[in-house]
Amino acid sequence: MSKIANVIGFEVMDSRGNPTVMAEVVLESGVVGTACAPSGASTGSREALELRDGDKSRYLGKGVLKAVANINETIKPLLVGKDVAAQRELDDIMLKADGTENKANLGANAILAVSLAAAKAAAQDKGIPLYAHIADINGTPGKYTMPVPMMNIINGGEHADNNVDIQEFMIQPVSAPNFTEALRMGAEVFHSLKKVLAGRGLNTAVGDEGGFAPNLPSNEAALEAIAEAVAAAGYKLGEEITLALDCASSEFYKDGVYDMSGEGKKFSPEEFADYLAELASKYPILSIEDGMDESDWDGWKVLTEKIGSTCQLVGDDLFVTNTKILKEGIDKSIANSILIKFNQIGSLSETLDAIKMAQEAGYTAVISHRSGETEDTTIADLAVATAAGQIKTGSLSRSDRVAKYNRLLRIEAELGEKAPYRGRAEFK
């Protein structure tokens, strides 16, 4: 048994220049595990609470000294002396100490950073990679796959300062024989897209997740630009490269209406479902995330019945990585996939529970970053360890995004054929 000797919290910076929480878990053996909590921009109302200080004199109120203090003063004495390999016990201790449904007392950012740091320390102590340790915890040792990257190459919505309503326009290199080649294909399309946009006199600055963020006349114009870039890169759209959307519909849903102000259109839920169905019939869109508002379950039902048999419908704000909400969705046949974000629920154990529930119900699970990221690459190991099959970690620029891709390259080099890349087969 490897015991925890110390737990230390720090205030560090994320990719948007805002503070976030870093935790170190130190073992009696001297091994140290370090992890950072990410932060979202478009957030579901039922996400676990990200504890911020609210002191306007520091970081415009976004400091996390309270969360750091909760690690150093409350969590540390509870975990010192505990077995670092007992992940669920450690997480349960922190959840019990918090005592709230949404982790409002200690902060999901504090609990998560410690939870992930403990897993990293345990993996190092065992002398195995993090993905192997997570697979052990998950009860799926050795059952690995390499995820299909869903690369967000045009950013809109809350992730960019432009007029595009849909938040993410993504490509998936589904024909690649392995992850390494998939990454190359995506990078080539990314560079091709820059030339396409520049050729139209459009801005090629990037948004929070590393994708381009130009002003465009419509959401469909983004798809048209990507289609041109795919062809210019020498690939066949629909065969080698497919598309995905993250609508983040909760950001433009008001009073029962989907108000896409960027292109001056308003839709009822039924009309918006028709709009998305039309896009999915016109372009090879394999996946649509948050196609309806998180509270519009009737709209979700309409959308699921309309295109759920042919398109992956991912619940992000809808499910917030929460098993209680996911179970309700499964029981009501709402959506057919869940987005997995550590900090929506706030601990590794609860994250694994959500993935397992989804997979057992025949739902896909898409592992995801947040728009506010750090150099932490845990989601790469999580995707491989759980054989989730899909990962969202941004575009092919910004080191906070590329760090995850580089980690996946190293994992594939280690595992080889033990972690197959299944491409289109991952999209049910």
Curated annotation (Swiss-Prot):
Q: Where does Mg(2+) bind?
A: 246, 289, 316
What is this protein called in UniProt?
Enolase
The similarity comment for this entry is: Belongs to the enolase family.
Native species: Saccharophagus degradans (strain 2-40 / ATCC 43961 / DSM 17024)
The UniProt keywords, alphabetically, are: Cytoplasm, Glycolysis, Lyase, Magnesium, Metal-binding, Secreted
- Any GO MF annotation of the entry: phosphopyruvate hydratase activity
One Pfam entry for this protein is Enolase_C
Q: Which residues form the active site?
A: 209 (proton donor), 341 (proton acceptor)
Task: Tell me the GO BP annotations in alphabetical order.
Answer: glycolytic process
Question: Localized where?
Answer: Cytoplasm; Secreted; Cell surface
On subunit structure and binding partners, the annotation says:
Component of the RNA degradosome, a multiprotein complex involved in RNA processing and mRNA degradation.
> What EC numbers are recorded for this enzyme?
4.2.1.11
Q: Which domain of life is it from?
A: Bacteria
For this protein, the record's CDD domains field holds:
enolase
